[in-house]
Regions:
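FAD-binding core/adjacent interface of flavoenzyme oxidoreductases
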Residues: 1-10, 25, 40, 44, ...
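Rossmann-like dinucleotide/flavin-binding elements
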Residues: 1-5, 9-35, 153-198, 283-331
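Beta1-alpha1 glycine-rich phosphate/pyrophosphate-binding loop at the start
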Residues: 2, 12-90, 175-204, 272-274
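Short glycine-/acidic-enriched loop or helix-start segments at secondary-structure transitions
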Residues: 19, 42, 103, 138-140, ...
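Short, glycine/charged-enriched secondary-structure capping and boundary segments
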Residues: 23, 45-49, 107, 141-145, ...
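Alpha-helical elements of Rossmann-like donor-binding domains used by nucleotide-donor carbohydrate transfer enzymes
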Residues: 80, 208, 315-318
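A Rossmann-like FAD-binding core segment of flavoenzymes
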Residues: 87-114, 121-124, 183-275, 331-343
Length: 344
């Protein structure tokens, strides 16, 4: 008999790990498939980043998050989630991108591709998609956005010392990046299409960015739309319709991110055309495709400020409880083949 998993989780972020741990606690055979490294999105955050939330709200698997900081750093979070994965021996296939899901409830075939192009295939009864949203930036769709000097992810400020840097956006990421660049002696211009900064900026960040703008340390172009990015400038249009050239060396377009809607559509998940929210049962987290569940921020569509680690980490409880309700929740397996199916 061919080995069949009970549950395959796509994504080894905190939510995906929490789902896998809940499945393991319920004695289900589970495998996690991850396109990058463990908690890949957190790994991609700026090295000096501090979480906005407290450590207990990041905990999964009933493992305490011990740290000297009330609000953990990126490094502390990486260490914590490594420890959780190690404690539970969570089975993860790293650097494999899921490219398709075929079959039906109880008999899915999940196809993946390793970074070296080697194809993989897994059979599973249920699928949990916990792919997050950080991989796909909201593009502006302007000429020059694909230039090497443009990035949709902020890292460290040191390389931009005494350089002219434009930060596009008006939410937390843009505000924090602008402040960090300013404090490393970059010449910063903040460009935002709205007349005011986002109301979602954290209360301890807002006065800092507003005061730097007020004193002129950071130039702010509000109610301003980016029209083109060139090798040495950013062309914008003000609210009055005036084209303006801003001298520029580098651009951080921190305009937000969104889930992989195209992948969800290929799987068969319905996407609301207005909100981009996927069709998902709020109680069970099962999508309109029977046997395919959604967990974490992927549920929120473009409203990615609604679901975070602190609430997405509980989705696994709902999902596994629903899977366990159905007769034959555990897949039949030959005694000599414990654990996940072999790689193909």
């Amino acid at each position: 008999m061919e080995c069949v998993l009970d549950v395959l989780v796509i994504g080894a972020g905190p939510t995906g790990l929490a789902c896998a741990i809940e499945a393991m606690r319920s004695n289900l055979d589970v495998l996690v498939v991850e396109k990058g490294c463990l908690v890949n999105s957190i790994f991609s955050y700026p090295p000096g980043m501090t979480f906005f939330t407290t450590r207990e709200r990041l905990e999964i698997g009933d493992i305490p998050f011990t740290t000297i900081n009330v609000k953990p750093t990126r490094a502390e979070a990486l260490e914590y989630y490594r420890g959780v994965a190690r404690f539970y021996h969570v089975p993860v296939r790293y650097h494999e991108r899921v490219v398709g899901i075929a079959g039906s409830d109880g008999n899915f075939e999940v196809r993946a591709a390793a970074t070296d192009g080697d194809p993989k295939c897994y059979r599973t009864r249920k699928v949990i998609i916990a792919t997050g949203y950080y991989d796909i930036p909201n593009l502006m769709g302007v000429p020059g956005e694909d230039l090497p000097k443009v990035s949709h992810y902020y890292g460290e400020a040191h390389a931009f010392y005494q350089r002219k840097v434009a930060v596009i956006g008006g939410a937390n990421s843009a505000a924090i990046a602008a402040l960090d660049l300013f404090r490393h002696s970059a010449e910063v211009t903040l460009i935002h299409r709205e007349p005011e900064l986002s109301r979602h900026i954290k209360y301890w960040v807002r006065p800092d960015i507003e005061n730097r703008i007020k004193e002129g340390s950071i130039r702010a172009c509000m109610a301003t739309a980016v029209r083109e990015i060139t090798r040495d400038a950013v062309w914008v249009e003000t609210a009055q319709g005036e084209p303006t050239r801003i001298e520029n060396d580098y651009v951080f377009a921190l305009t937000g991110y969104h889930p992989d809607f195209e992948f969800l559509r290929r799987v068969g998940v319905e996407i609301d055309p207005g909100t981009s929210r996927p069709n998902c049962n709020a109680k069970t987290r099962e999508s309109n495709v029977p046997g395919v569940y959604l967990a974490g921020v992927v549920i929120s569509g473009r409203h990615t400020n609604e679901i975070f680690i602190e609430n997405g980490r509980f989705h696994g409880n709902q999902i596994i409880a629903d899977i366990q309700k159905h007769p034959g929740a555990r897949a039949p397996r030959p005694k000599e083949t414990a654990g996940p199916p072999p790689l193909e």
